[in-house]
């Protein structure tokens, strides 16, 4: 959770317990070599954005889990080495990679098995007021 303090619990205590997610960031992940090879590694056509998400979804589709471990602390300076997507070329690449991901993984994006269906998809952890109960 971006900018969370060490003493925060997170929604439903998720910052304190191991939890499965459809995808985690590759800024810090570990996976057995044989599973990495079985999955086919990172999709190198996704140059910057989403290669980790694509990988994690393929891991999930093979029946494995992407587990967040709260006891691991990491500080990651997003875009520190490559810079921000502020040029028109970088932004165009980002849009193309976003489209690729949505086209390929629409089923997971629209029906994430680890996201509470009562939450809105338009904001973080907000109840969807338009959903029938």
Kindly give the residue locations of the regions a language model identified:
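Generic hydrophobic alpha-helical scaffold/packing signal
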Residues: 28, 56-57, 102
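Catalytic donor-sugar/metal-binding loop of nucleotide-sugar-dependent glycosyltransferases
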Residues: 36-37, 44-47, 53-75
């Amino acid at each position: 959770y971006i900018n969370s303090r060490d003493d925060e619990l997170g929604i439903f205590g998720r910052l304190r317990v191991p939890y499965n997610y459809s995808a985690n960031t590759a800024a810090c992940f570990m996976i057995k070599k044989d599973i990495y090879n079985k999955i086919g590694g990172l999709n190198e056509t996704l140059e910057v954005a989403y290669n980790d998400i694509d990988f994690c979804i393929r891991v999930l589709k093979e029946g494995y889990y992407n587990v967040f471990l709260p006891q691991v602390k990491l500080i990651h300076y997003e875009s520190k080495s490559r810079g921000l997507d502020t040029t028109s070329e970088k932004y165009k690449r980002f849009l193309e990679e976003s489209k690729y991901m949505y086209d390929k993984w629409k089923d997971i994006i629209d029906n994430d098995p680890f996201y509470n269906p009562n939450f809105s998809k338009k904001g973080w952890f907000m109840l969807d007021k338009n959903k029938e109960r």
